[in-house]
Amino acid sequence: MAVSTVSSFLLPSFGIPSSSPSSTRLKVSLLPSSSTHGGLSSCVLTKPSVSLTKVFAVPDTLDPTPEILDEPASEVPSSSSISVDADKMAPKQKIRIKLRSYWVPLIEDSCKQILDAARNTNAKTMGPVPLPTKKRIYCVLKSPHVHKDARFHFEIRTHQRMIDILYPTAQTIDSLMQLDLPAGVDVEVKL
C-alpha cells in the first residue's frame, strides 16, 4: 500500500525582475507536518517587500515506510509463478474450425457432430460462434433482348460458424478425422 502526501507552498504572484538580483531573494520557510493540516506539510516562499502570494499543491516524494516492506504479502512474485498463470490464461495449442454452408440445418448438424466428438475426448470447446452471413447478389435481365428495366435478383447466402477446441489431444484429432460430415459443408481447420 503506497502512502501519498501532498505539500503546499506559497509563491509570490508577481513577476521577478531580472535586473536586480539582490532584490529577488526569496525567503523560504518550511512548516512541519501536523494533525491540524490533515497530514500536509507546507513550504512558504515569500519576498520580504510584497505580501501577495499564490498557493500551489505538489505531491511529496513517496518514501515507503519500513512496516510495509517487512510484510510477507508484499513480496515480488517469482517468474515461475507468472509463467504458470500465463499457461492457465492462454492455451499453447488450439484447433480452430470454420464451417461454411448454404443451408443452415446442415451447418448446425455438423457443428453438433464436431462438439460431441471433441467433448467425448475431454477437450474444452468454445462455440459454435455464428459469423456474419455473406450475401452474393446477382442481377440478371428478364428479357433476352430488350426491356432493360425488368431484372431478376438472385442471391447466394453463405452461413458460417467457428469452433475452437482448446487443449486437444491425439485422441481428439483422431476422432475429428473419423467424422463423416455432409458434402454441403465446407470445413477449414487451422492448428
UniProtKB/Swiss-Prot annotation:
GO terms for molecular function: mRNA binding; structural constituent of ribosome. Keywords: Chloroplast, Plastid, Ribonucleoprotein, Ribosomal protein, Transit peptide. GO terms for biological process: translation. Pfam families: Ribosomal_S10. It is found in: Plastid, Chloroplast. Residues 1-56 form a transit peptide. Signal peptide: none annotated. Belongs to the universal ribosomal protein uS10 family. Its main location: plastid. This is Small ribosomal subunit protein uS10c. NCBIfam families: PRK00596.1, rpsJ_bact.
